[in-house]
Amino acid sequence: LKIRLDDAQQANRKYRWLSSRNLPSGTRSYSWVHVTGNTQSKRAFLTEGPLKGDVASFLAQDALFICIGGVNALNGLNDTIRGLGVREVVEGMDMDQMTNPNVRKAVLAMRREVQKIPGIRYSKYTWNPAYKGVDDYLLSRAATM
């Protein structure tokens, strides 16, 4: 279970995964891959966070978005890409990769994993870093139309 925290004191910890891992017969929480938009598309944008992907897909006229739970949450990503039959993956990860070395390292590892998939063309979508996420950037474009 993933819960959004609205704690101004910990702005860097927006979401928490809940589990019963420490309880008798408990289980850990598992990250999952969220897919939104036109699943017939041969191009998929890859980003972090299901809500961000839903918003970005809507703002990009139903573009296909594959959304991981976090930059280190890669379980199931390659299988999802293969299962959708996409030919192109466009990285749309948050711009904090430019300033946070830990995020950058995780994004590079993710990129290497996706690039191992045969037949996939991989590119990176870039925008003005004043907009942290692809959803923020697309919303700014929609607001000026």
Question: Where are the predicted features?
Answer:
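Short, small/acidic-rich helices and loops at N termini and domain boundaries
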Residues: 136-145
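Phosphate-handling DNA/RNA-contact segment within nucleic-acid enzymes
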Residues: 1-85
